[in-house]
């Protein structure tokens, strides 16, 4: 499993209020941030994740590298939806954050959400892409919401940041539809190349062989049908929780009966 430090960059611009992705573009990112965080941690327990907001007056670091999702969640709760996306600045801050990671053995990766029109110039972004490539920083971009305006430029950016011998950076373009944003991410190379099926992310077991084997017993390949795999996992977890509740209820019922027995002997 790849050992990585990952910086997530969220787009908290005014465009993130739009409701074409349930419930809004911003809330779709929150669900996806949790999904990616868990997938990274499940892929390798020594992976760490940081968080940056890309819009507002200036991009800012919401959480330094951590293995605790609570710190990421606190950063998300402190985020305000405002202004426009400063993509180049946010990526530069992410690169600087990666440079100061504690574990220098960790590979460097940025995962950026883009759901608003990019205002940075093409030349500026291509120069930045080449700098990131030179410093061995991989970049994944989740492009949604304003894809007609952004896709061509983001294609060029990813082409510039990628190493031809090893394409470690990816562009995922998502259109509105029945699948949630994180479900599209789950079946993309952003997650699948981590050595995790992605469906273990919310379940906490991380694409282990037992879980995948269970899915295969149902005739489901998690990498091919992540939505069905997720539904099966949730169903199995609910059944496990139901059985656990029944077991606890049975134990509670047995305890009073056991405590009453000595009293009956004393009366006799």
Curated annotation (Swiss-Prot):
Residues 248-261 have a biased composition (Low complexity). Signal peptide: none annotated. Ubiquitinated, leading to its degradation. Ubiquitination is promoted by HUL5. One of its GO terms (cellular component) is nucleus. Residues 223-242 form the UIM domain. Residues 235-247 have a biased composition (Basic and acidic residues). Disruption phenotype: Cells are viable. Residues 226-268 are annotated as: Disordered. The keyword Chloroplast does not apply. Residues 5-190 form the VWFA domain. One of its GO terms (molecular function) is K48-linked polyubiquitin modification-dependent protein binding. InterPro entries: PSMD4 (IPR027040), UIM_dom (IPR003903), VWF_A (IPR002035), vWFA_dom_sf (IPR036465). Keywords: Proteasome, Ubl conjugation. It holds the Pfam family VWA_2. The keyword Ubl conjugation applies. Multiubiquitin binding protein. Present with 17200 molecules/cell in log phase SD medium. Belongs to the proteasome subunit S5A family. The 26S proteasome is composed of a core protease, known as the 20S proteasome, capped at one or both ends by the 19S regulatory complex (RC). The RC is composed of at least 18 different subunits in two subcomplexes, the base and the lid, which form the portions proximal and distal to the 20S proteolytic core, respectively. This is 26S proteasome regulatory subunit RPN10.
């Amino acid at each position: 499993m790849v050992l990585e430090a990952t910086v997530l960059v969220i787009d908290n611009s005014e465009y993130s209020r739009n409701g074409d992705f349930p419930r809004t573009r911003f809330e779709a990112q929150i669900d996806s941030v949790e999904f990616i965080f868990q997938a990274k941690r499940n892929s390798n327990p020594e992976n760490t994740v940081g968080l940056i907001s890309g819009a507002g007056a200036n991009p800012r670091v919401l959480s330094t590298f951590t293995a605790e999702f609570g710190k990421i969640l606190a950063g998300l709760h402190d985020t305000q939806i405002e202004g426009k996306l400063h993509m180049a600045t946010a990526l530069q801050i992410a690169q600087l954050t990666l440079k100061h990671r504690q574990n220098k053995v960790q590979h460097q990766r940025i995962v950026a959400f883009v759901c608003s029109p990019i205002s940075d110039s093409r030349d500026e972004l291509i120069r930045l892409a080449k700098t990131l490539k030179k410093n061995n920083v991989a970049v994944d971009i989740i492009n949604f919401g304003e894809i007609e305006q952004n896709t061509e430029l983001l294609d060029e950016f990813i082409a510039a940041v990628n190493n031809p011998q090893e394409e470690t950076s990816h562009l995922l373009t998502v259109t509105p539809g029945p699948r949630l944003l994180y479900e599209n991410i789950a079946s993309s190379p952003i997650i699948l190349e981590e050595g995790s099926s992605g469906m273990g992310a919310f379940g906490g077991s991380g694409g282990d062989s037992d879980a995948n084997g269970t899915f295969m017993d149902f005739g489901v390949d998690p990498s091919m049908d992540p939505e069905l795999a997720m539904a099966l996992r949730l169903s199995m977890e609910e059944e496990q929780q139901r059985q656990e509740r029944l077991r606890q209820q049975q134990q509670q019922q047995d305890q009073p009966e056991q405590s009453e027995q000595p009293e009956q002997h004393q009366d006799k």
